[in-house]
């Protein structure tokens, strides 16, 4: 069953690019929660020693947001059971990343900034609305972090509650905040500015230019040239 309604924007002979993007977003989310579910059902204690890293925000747009509420409930439930599941999502593009470029250079090294709803709407989204940003779509709070002059980043950390991350932003509301911040310097990559090694390695594996698939495409292209 297409619970997200992806088929509604499709016709018999056409599907917009957004369908593929939405499908990928759901797939990535389900994939990162697969090991979490496995350990939760078999050995919860292992989750205390794990950090799950997602390439992109902890957010699901439009109809995909149906998943955000149960995800928030899971994080809250796990915390109530004494299991603080550590997860981050790193944003490398978009309005929050663009804003980081404006404020990052003047921010002190070792600083962390959690914007509230007013700041997000006025300074980043440039809206006049008082609506709570991401209350239905996000399952993580946005943070601007400057570890050093080379590593400045926008990351998301779950809170387990709807909208709390912008109406009353606080480090205490961020699940496993201290352990996450302590772990970040250990997984930095110096290959790219603001890069995290797990994401860099994942993107490297997915790159066609790195693995045999690139050679396959090259052979296919050469064969076509000869015909």
What do the PLM-derived regions correspond to, one by one?
Residues 2-227:
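Long, contiguous domain-sized segments
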């Amino acid at each position: 069953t297409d619970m997200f309604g992806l088929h509604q924007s499709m016709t018999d002979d056409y599907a917009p690019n957004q369908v593929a993007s939405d499908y990928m977003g759901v797939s990535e989310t389900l994939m990162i929660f697969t090991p979490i579910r496995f350990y939760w059902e078999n050995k919860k204690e292992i989750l205390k020693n794990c950090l799950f890293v997602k390439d992109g925000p902890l957010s699901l747009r439009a109809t995909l947001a149906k998943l955000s509420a149960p995800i928030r409930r899971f994080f809250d439930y796990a915390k109530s059971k004494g299991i603080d599941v550590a997860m981050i999502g790193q944003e490398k593009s978009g309005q929050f990343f663009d804003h980081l470029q404006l404020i990052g250079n003047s921010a002190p090294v070792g600083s962390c900034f959690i914007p509230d709803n007013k700041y997000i709407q006025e300074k980043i989204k440039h809206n006049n609305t008082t609506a709570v940003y991401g209350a239905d779509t996000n399952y993580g709070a946005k943070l601007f972090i400057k570890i050093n002059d080379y590593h400045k980043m926008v990351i998301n950390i779950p809170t387990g509650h709807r909208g709390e991350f912008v109406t009353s932003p606080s480090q205490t509301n961020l699940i496993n905040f201290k352990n996450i911040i302590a772990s970040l310097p250990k997984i930095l990559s110096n290959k790219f500015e603001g890069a995290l090694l797990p994401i860099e390695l994942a993107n490297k594996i997915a790159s066609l230019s790195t693995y045999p698939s690139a050679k396959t495409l090259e052979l296919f292209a050469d064969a076509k040239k000869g015909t």
